[in-house]
Amino acid sequence: MTIALSVENLTAAVGGREILKGIQLDLPFGEVHALMGPNGSGKSTLCHVLSGRPGYEVVGSAHLAGAPLLGLDVDERARLGLMQGFQYPVEIPGVKLGEFVAEAAAEAGMGEDEIERRVAEAAEKFDMTRFLQRGVNEDLSGGEKKRSEIFQMAVLGPKVALLDEIDSGLDIDAVREVAEAVEVMRSPEVGVLMITHYSRILRYVIPDRVHVMVDGRLVDSGGPELADELEAGGYEAVRARLGLAPGGENGQAKAKVTDLFTDLPFET
C-alpha cells in the first residue's frame, strides 16, 4: 500500500488560536477517505493548510507521495499533484472551459496530443462535452459546477484530490450526480480526501475509510459503518463512546447528523 498523502502531528493556528491539534492521517493511492465533523471542527482548515492557503501558523509535516508539502506555495503544491475542489466554484465568464483546462494541462507539461485526448476522454466520462465551449462554470447548476471541478481534476491527473464540502448546498439529485462523478474518479493513481458534514453523500460514494474530526483533532477512524453510527446517533454518540466531553470547546450543538441534512452552505 503506497501512501499518497501523509500528515504527521500537524497543528495550525491563526493569531495564536490553535485550530488543528496534532493531526495524523495517511491516505493511500486508490482510496477514497471521508473526513466528517461538526461545523467549526477544523475540516476545511485542514484542507486549506494542505493546499497552501497563507495566513496559518503551521507546525508538523505533510508529504505528497513522499515529497514535503509545507513551505511550498500553492502553485508548487499543484505541480506536485495536489488539487482542491472548492465549496463554491467561481464563474469565469468569457474563458471557455475547454481552453481553460487545456492551458492548465499545458502548464503542467502535457503535450498537445495528450491534452486533446485527456480532455475528450474526461469530457465524455463526466458528461461535460456540451460545456467545453461555455465560460468556466457559467450558468451551471450547483451539481454541474462541482462535476466541472472533478472533470478538470481528471484531465490534470492529480495524485491527491481534496474535495472540500463538495456536497454543500446541493439538493439530493445533485448530490447523487456529484457522488457518481467521485466514483468515476476512483483510480489506483489518485487518493481522494472528501470533506463533508453529511453522511447522505456516503450513500452513493462508499469510502474506504471514515475519519471524524472534533475540536481540531481526529478522534476516530473506521470503515463506512462509522458514517452509519454518525447518522444514527450524531457526533455526541461518538463523543460518548470515546469518553470525550460533550459539546466541545466551541460550544457545538448536540445535533444529529440527520439534523444537518439541509442545503445551507457551511464554512468550516
Residues covered by each model-derived region:
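Q-loop/switch helix immediately C-terminal to the Walker
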Residues: Y88, G94-E107
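ABC ATPase C-loop
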Residues: M153-A154
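Conserved beta-strand-loop-alpha-helix hinge in the C-terminal portion
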Residues: M213, R217-A240
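Conserved structural motif at the start of ABC-family nucleotide-binding domains
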Residues: L5-V7, L20-G22
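Walker B catalytic motif
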Residues: E165-I166
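Conserved ABC ATPase "signature" region
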Residues: E114-F131
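The feature captures the beta-strand-to-loop junction immediately N-terminal to the Walker
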Residues: M36-P38
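ABC ATPase NBD Q-loop/coupling interface
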Residues: S61-R77, N137
